[in-house]
UniProtKB/Swiss-Prot annotation:
Modification Glycine amide occurs at: 29
Lineage, uppermost ranks: Eukaryota, Metazoa, Chordata, Craniata, Vertebrata
Stated role: Isotocin causes contraction of smooth muscles.
InterPro entries: Neurhyp_horm (IPR000981), Neurhyp_horm_dom_sf (IPR036387), Neurohypophysial_hormone_CS (IPR022423)
A molecular-function term among this protein's GO annotations: neurohypophyseal hormone activity
Predominant subcellular localization, coarse grouping: secreted
Post-translational modification: Seven disulfide bonds are present in neurophysin.
Pfam families (UniProt xref): Hormone_5
Protein name stated in the entry: Isotocin-neurophysin IT 1
Keyword Signal: yes
Disulfide bonds: 21-26, 42-86, 45-59, 53-76, 60-66, 93-106, 100-118, 107-112
Signal peptide region: 1-20
Length: 157
């Protein structure tokens, strides 16, 4: 009889530990409070705060393109420490929950890629002015490839 009650008590203890929030992933107010937070815009970033954070080291905006792993995007790390989720806006693009970040560029939390679905008629004019001919497209592809292979800049204290 005593063994059964101890087993039941241990089972209840393990169950409570398994369903508990941990310090790193528990929102303020408990697990169910995450749905109570209203969505908000992601933090501003980049030159003149004209961009929005798309990930911990990605800052993109209309007319400025995207900064990945650069000092302009360094402030985006703070987004990880805020208790409520944010939305960057823009159309859904890419295969992994990406959003249109700038004309012709789709970004998610991990990185950015060229995506033609992010190009509208008025945005196509912006691209043709800033990047001319297929040579410009090749240059943009090389830059995106370089950015994805270079480690982010680190600030050492």
């Amino acid at each position: 009889m005593f063994g059964t009650s101890v087993s039941a008590l241990c089972l209840l203890f393990l169950l409570s530990v398994c369903t508990a929030c941990y310090i790193s992933n528990c929102p303020i107010g408990g697990k169910r409070s995450a749905l109570a937070f209203p969505s908000r815009k992601c933090m501003s970033c980049g030159p003149g705060d004209r961009g929005r954070c798309f990930g911990p080291n990605i800052c993109c905006g209309e007319g400025m393109g995207c900064y990945v792993g650069s000092p302009e995007a360094a402030g985006c790390v703070e987004e990880n420490y805020l208790p409520s989720p944010c939305e960057v806006g823009g159309r859904v693009c890419g295969s992994e929950e990406g959003r249109c970040a700038a004309p012709g560029i789709c970004c998610d939390v991990e990185g950015c890629s060229i995506d033609q679905s992010c190009t509208e008629e008025d945005e196509a004019e912006y691209i043709s002015q800033s990047v001319s001919s297929s040579h410009g497209h090749d240059l943009l592809m090389k830059l995106l490839n370089m950015i994805s292979h270079t480690p982010p800049h680190r600030v050492h204290k």
